Design a protein with these regions (language model features):
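N-terminal nucleophile
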Residues: 2-266
Length: 266
C-alpha cells in the first residue's frame, strides 16, 4: 500500500503516436482518509499536479516547459525501515530542476537510500528516463509502451501485463484512428482504468504481505473499506500543449472531472 500518495499503476506510450510524444493513463491508490488536493496549478510554482496534503509532495506532475514525472511506490511488506525523505518530493524536485532527465536521475541515485522503495519516470519533450532505488539504475527509454505498478518494471507482474494488453490492443488503436470522438476516447480510458479483474492466486507476486492483500491489490482498479483507487488520470502531450483529465474515484467528489489544458512554452 502507498504511504506517500504515489501512483500505483501507470501505462504510457512514448513517441509512439504521431504528434503526441506522450500519452499516459494511471491510477493513484491510497488510504481514503489521507488528505489530498486534486489536480491544479500550484501557487508560485511552475508545477501542475495534485498534491498530498500530508507530506506536501505529489505523485505525478507536469510543467509548461514540457517536463513531466511520475512515481510509484515499490511494495515490500518486509521493509520495516523508517525513511527520512518522502518519495512525493521527487516529482517536485525534478519539475523545478533544469537538469536533463538522465542527469537528474543519476544525481538522485547518489542518495536514493534515503527514500522508501520507488519507481520513478522523469522526462521532457525529447528524453524519458526510468529508475528504481530497489535495483534499476537510471536508463533512457527507447520509443515504446511502458507499464509499471509496485514492482520493478523488469519484473512484469500479471497485473501490468493485463494493463499493457488492454492499453496496446484496445486503447492505442482508437488513438490511431484518423477521426475519433473525444468522448469515445475518454470512455475507453475509464473502462480500462476501472477494470476490477483480479489475478488468480497462483500468479500473484510475493511482496511480503498476505495473500488476501496481494489479491486485493492485483486489479487495475482497487476498492476496499479503507483503501483504494482515489483518482484516475489521462494525460497527453501534443506538439503544443498538455491535455490532462483527472477523475475522482472515491469520496464526496466521486465522479468529478478536472480537465486542464496547459500550453507548452516554445
Amino acid at each position: 500500500m502507498s504511504e506517500t500518495g504515489s501512483m500505483c499503476i501507470v501505462a504510457f506510450a512514448w513517441h509512439v503516436l504521431d504528434e503526441m510524444p506522450l500519452c499516459l493513463i494511471s491510477n493513484r491508490d491510497e488510504f481514503y482518509h489521507r488528505p489530498s488536493a486534486p489536480l491544479h496549478q500550484w501557487e508560485n510554482r511552475p508545477i501542475v499536479a495534485g498534491q498530498d496534503l500530508q507530506s506536501g509532495g505529489t505523485w505525478m506532475g507536469v510543467t509548461a516547459a514540457g517536463r513531466w514525472a511520475i512515481v510509484t511506490n515499490f511494495r515490500n511488506g518486509r521493509d520495516k525501515n523508517q525513511y527520512s525523505t518522502s518519495r512525493g518530493h521527487l516529482i517536485q524536485d525534478f519539475l523545478e530542476s533544469d537538469l536533463a532527465p538522465i542527469r537528474f536521475a543519476q544525481m538522485l541515485e547518489q542518495n536514493q537510500q534515503d527514500y522508501a522503495g520507488f519507481n520513478l519516470f522523469v522526462g521532457d519533450r525529447e528524453q524519458a528516463v526510468y529508475m528504481s532505488n530497489r535495483g534499476e539504475a537510471p536508463q533512457v527509454l527507447a520509443n515504446g509502451v511502458y507499464v509499471v505498478s509496485n514492482g520493478l518494471m523488469s519484473e512484469d507482474w500479471h497485473k501490468t501485463r493485463h494493463l499493457r494488453k488492454r492499453f496496446t490492443q484496445e486503447f492505442l488503436p482508437i488513438l490511431q484512428q484518423p477521426q475519433v470522438a473525444e468522448l469515445d476516447l475518454v470512455s475507453a480510458v475509464w473502462d480500462i482504468l476501472e477494470d476490477e479483474r483480479k489475478i488468480i492466486p497462483k500468479l500473484l507476486p510475493d511482496t511480503g504481505i498476505s495473500q488476501e492483500m496481494e489479491a486485493l491489490l492485483s486489479s487495475t482498479f482497487i476498492q476496499s473499506p479503507i483503501y483504494g483507487t482515489r483518482c484516475s488520470n489521462f494525460l497527453r502531450m501534443t506538439t503544443d500543449q498538455w491535455q490532462w483529465i483527472e477523475k475522482t474515484q472515491q469520496g464526496e467528489q466521486q465522479g468529478k472531472f478536472i480537465e486542464l489544458t496547459i500550453p507548452l512554452v516554445k
